């Protein structure tokens, strides 16, 4: 009985449960999953202004880029109980010392945070397809001597 909604300002398709207002999707959904590229438009999509719209006890998943979500705000939301949990395979300032990262510290303390490496697409099948594609590309374009 799960209902799936989505927000994309660039897609207009009546087949889907599209919500046209980003803050409305924050209010409506129990699980928010972000799958966007990083741009000026998507930088800190979750921020100090719109965190209040998020459904209490929501779970947030970010598999995009770390900068999509303002980590400072997420850390505060998890600590206060506003957000029930956060899962990500990316963090802001990914090249900084993770020992000083408050989000990493929440995970270490068992505060409903999961952080994994950004390699979900690196399955055996995906890697094999890349190998085949690249081999065919090099052979077809005479790039192998």
Regions found by a protein language model. Name each.
Residues 6-9, 33-35, 62, 88, ...:
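Short beta-strands and strand-loop turn motifs
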Residues 57, 64-145:
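Rossmann-like dinucleotide-binding domain for NAD(H)/NADP(H)
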Residues 1-56:
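Rossmann-like dinucleotide/phosphate-binding beta-alpha-beta segment
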């Amino acid at each position: 009985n799960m209902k799936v909604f989505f927000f994309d300002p660039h897609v207009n398709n009546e087949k889907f449960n599209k919500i046209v207002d980003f803050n409305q999707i924050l209010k409506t959904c129990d699980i928010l999953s972000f799958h966007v590229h990083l741009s000026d438009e998507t930088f800190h999509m979750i921020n100090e202004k719109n965190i209040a719209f998020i459904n209490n006890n929501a779970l947030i998943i970010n598999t995009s880029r770390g900068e999509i979500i303002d980590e400072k705000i997420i850390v505060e939301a998890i600590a206060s109980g506003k957000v029930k949990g956060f899962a990500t395979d990316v963090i802001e300032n990914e090249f900084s010392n993770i020992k000083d990262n408050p989000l990493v510290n929440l995970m270490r303390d068992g505060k409903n945070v999961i952080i994994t490496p950004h390699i979900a697409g690196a399955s055996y099948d995906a890697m094999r397809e890349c190998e085949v594609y690249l081999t065919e590309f090099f052979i077809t374009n005479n790039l192998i001597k």
